[in-house]
């Protein structure tokens, strides 16, 4: 015999009694709303943040290599690390009369530049990195190892990429015991459920989107056929300035708001089981099937950006600007091949 958790309704359980107990749409919503209103505040734990790197600390310094171009990742609109015009070996070596000269995608860089500054010691620093500033940067170093020795020349290449954090969202799937698949009650229930979920996360500046809702007849083990609703929806954070209640403090970070929304949704479905388990009346025609709530984490990038672990192993979960020869027209996570693309961050393949 199957062991059931307290208050759990068997998946194949039918309505008790001979009289019909199909609830009206408003009554169906009342059952869900009861669970919502009784739910305690969600436990505040953070969602797993993408393991991307944050290269905006002033103390972080990047050195070059004479063997291969060094990749540098700068978060969009942020300050870059110090890109040094030396190798790791020369960094700890005394240099006599050093001379530094930097060239970027648009030509020679000068110390007076407001967006890309060259310090007196040859370090390159970006103050507010823009997507169009991505590209190859070359430093020409001229120095003497000692006063007596002749001048040596060194050329170091860096590929500087703009990157952004993924705009992830959660996708949920839940199953409900349903009325006959052609019943209007299923449609009414779906609309009311979406309204309740949307209201649940409204104050967190998150939005609920229906992905699909399908009704199927399912053959149960050692039982007959029953109708089930397969309900798939997503929850994503929206820009706080676009929300009904603009928010600017630290708690308004998208990942924190989305984590709280996820907790509220999970608690909402748990409460549905608890409420039904305490009912003295027969089960309604439509009710949540315990244990069927599934959740997956879905990443998405802005157009012109993509995730590529093989190409960017130092920034494996960053949405890195698409390199020339590739593009991303939508919010997918991959830059697609396009031989005609000649710029960084291409959104179309011309």
Swiss-Prot record:
Keywords: Cytoplasmic vesicle, Glycoprotein, Membrane, Secreted, Signal
Post-translational modification comment from the UniProt entry: N-glycosylated.
GO process terms (BP): acrosome assembly; binding of sperm to zona pellucida
InterPro entries noted in UniProt: Ig-like_fold (IPR013783), Sp38-bd (IPR010857), ZPBP1/2_C (IPR048805), ZPBP1/2_N (IPR048806)
Membrane topology designation: Peripheral membrane protein
A Pfam family that the UniProt record links to this protein: Sp38
Domain of life per record: Eukaryota
Deletion consequences: Male mice are infertile with abnormal round-headed sperm morphology and no forward sperm motility.
Disulfide bonds: none
GO CC annotation, single: cell body
Tissue localization of expression: Expressed in testis (at protein level). Expressed in male germ cells.
Primary subcellular site in the record, as a coarse category: cytoplasm
Signal peptide region: 1-44
Compartments where found: Cytoplasmic vesicle, Secretory vesicle, Acrosome; Cytoplasmic vesicle, Secretory vesicle, Acrosome membrane; Secreted
Residues carrying sugar: 113, 186, 339
Function: Plays a role in acrosome compaction and sperm morphogenesis. Is implicated in sperm-oocyte interaction during fertilization.
Family membership noted in the UniProt record: Belongs to the zona pellucida-binding protein Sp38 family.
Listed name of the protein: Zona pellucida-binding protein 1
Protein species of origin: Mus musculus (Mouse)
Gene: Zpbp
